[in-house]
Amino acid sequence: MHDFGSTVLCCTPSYSLYLADAIKDSGLPREEFKLKIGAFGAEPWTENMRNEIEEKLGIKAYDIYGLSEIAGPGVGYECECQHGTHLNEDHYFPEIINPNTLEPAAPGETGELVFTHLTKEGMPLLRYRTKDLTALHYDKCTCGRTLVRMDRILGRSDDMLIIRGVNVFPTQIESVILEMEEFEPHYLLIVDRKNNTDTMEL
């Protein structure tokens, strides 16, 4: 990035923090890097992680959404207003369903994201369950675009932990960790059952 004068970084959010640490360890001044913006996806990340990326790399961080079964990267992007990810609904029909009942969710209600191909000719998918948990918003964005907006991915329906009857998503824990300066954004959750009681160790 330094030698080529790269201005855009595309990777996972966690790898961008690794790169930020590598830049710091290299001894090269951050000001010598020409990075301006980053497009990050492929894993859930929080607003706190966005703030940390922007602070450590001195860039503007944008969310990008995609999955290989639908089209790879580029199913949706954040706009400059960053009020959600605009989905390219001229190519895909997005829906939110309750992951347990499979019934459609109300606009703005969190549930599992489902896609149907509209323009793919070879092997189109119908109501493909992504396992990603989010919500959709249909009001016009302040940027002027009218494409449906998707909230940041909360987690996956198959990643959700139920501990003592409480639904726990790893991204919720990450959000709290990143508010504490003494912690790095790398963590391990150990969930166990002791004496018939669920326990979680961080």
Task: Give the location of each predicted region.
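Active-site glycine/GP-rich loop and adjacent strand/helix microenvironment
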Residues: M1-L202
